Amino acid sequence: MDSLVIISWIEHLYILLVLIVVITVLTSGKKAGSVMAWIFAIMFLPIVGIILYIALGVNWRKRRLLRSKFENSPNKVLSKMSSDMSKREISKYDTKDTFNTSPLKLDNVDDLTKEIDEYGGREISKLLYTTGGTYLTKNSSYDFYFDGGEAFDSIISDLENAKESIYMEYFIWKSDVLGEKIKDILLRKAKEGLDIKLIFDGLGSFGRISLKYRKSLEAAGIEFRYFLDVKYKLLKLNYRNHRKMVIVDSKILHTGGMNLGQEYIDGGKAFDSWRDTNSRIEGELVLHYLAVFISDWMSSNGKFNFILPKEIPVSDGDYLMQVSASGPDTIWSSLQMLYTKLITEATEEILIESPYFVPDDGILEQLQIAALAGISVKIIIAGKPDKKIPFWVAETYFEDLLNSGIEVYRYQKGFLHCKNIIVDEKISTMGTCNFD
């Protein structure tokens, strides 16, 4: 009798556990197909299904990333600035505790957004603010570079002329010909007393920076961090930092699709040339990128000891720009939402450039709807791949794209690596996010 009672209690506890796990799955925010698959596994694979869900169905690492990143988010860095855009000395940052202040409100945001109301820009700007905490900014100058040699000549020139600080972040950083040239400049600047901090992605730069190279940086007092180093933790493989930025004296920004490697200049051994897009920007946007860099630095166990601008950068320039930073450590998929919004707002034309094209079902359907509604949709992807699998996967979408009237082109003059979207010749995106 006692054994029957014990068995009965075990059965009841197991049923309770199943109900708890099923409710957890239902409220997890996963897509419907994933939810149904896990519920079937839990119901029809006793015990094993629950163990599998706890081990594989819950993204524990992303939860930790979100908690860590929230403490040092770009928005919290920006929130330490003045409550208006008037020139005013920035308070000194000492610890993470100083991040806990009221959100920054820029007085000129409403005026700026009035300028872009005619093509739905206000809604796009608000979307980026609510999902990423960034603001529309005015900028005095920008230059685009489509040739790696010109882009890195500009970067090298600004590094040579740096007076206070150099902050660089790259998915791929190589200790090759270009990497050595950059290193020599950084070593000289370190001797001049500049604050220099570097972030390399733990996977993208894995095995690409020699020990001798790293030791020379350390010997010069140059700080560097690997973002989520994968050397000992394979579970981090999918959580990458794909950003590419150079910030000089908190006044000049270089960003775009180019990593730091010689092939971005000459195409390397595999390609005759490399087609990419990079930019040099001066203006208020630089402060936002600085906040992103600081956030990534703090999340990589870096100490908060930065040389920050003594005055909040204010520009009367005509170039309106806003940063969208997204990743596994953000609550909202800001970039995915931005792309969806841009596609649905289009009235005449959508132009997309990306080396890889593997859209999710939602964005694919929005592109098809746009084309079927008479909007011109043109997509350029790499014609010569550097990675075979995404190239082959992209081909599986061609029939659906072409049948809905979307034009698809393959770039043949080298490797296409730029990531751009232009909508109605009014709004464009340029950066480091592939369309996959």
Residue ranges, per PLM feature:
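Aromatic (often tryptophan-rich) hydrophobic motifs at membrane interfaces
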Residues: 348, 366, 376-380, 407-410, ...
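Helical hairpin unit composed of two closely spaced alpha helices linked by a short loop
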Residues: 356-377, 382, 387
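Long hydrophobic segments that form regular secondary structure
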Residues: 335-352, 369-372, 376
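Short, contiguous acidic/charged loop-to-helix segments that flank catalytic cores in large enzymes
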Residues: 330, 356-358, 384-392, 408-411, ...
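N-terminal localization/anchoring segments of enzymes in phospholipid and broader phosphate metabolism
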Residues: 1-336, 341, 345, 385, ...
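Thr-Gly-centered strand-to-loop micro-motif
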Residues: 352-354, 411, 430-431
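Short, well-ordered secondary-structure micro-motifs
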Residues: 363, 390-392, 421, 433
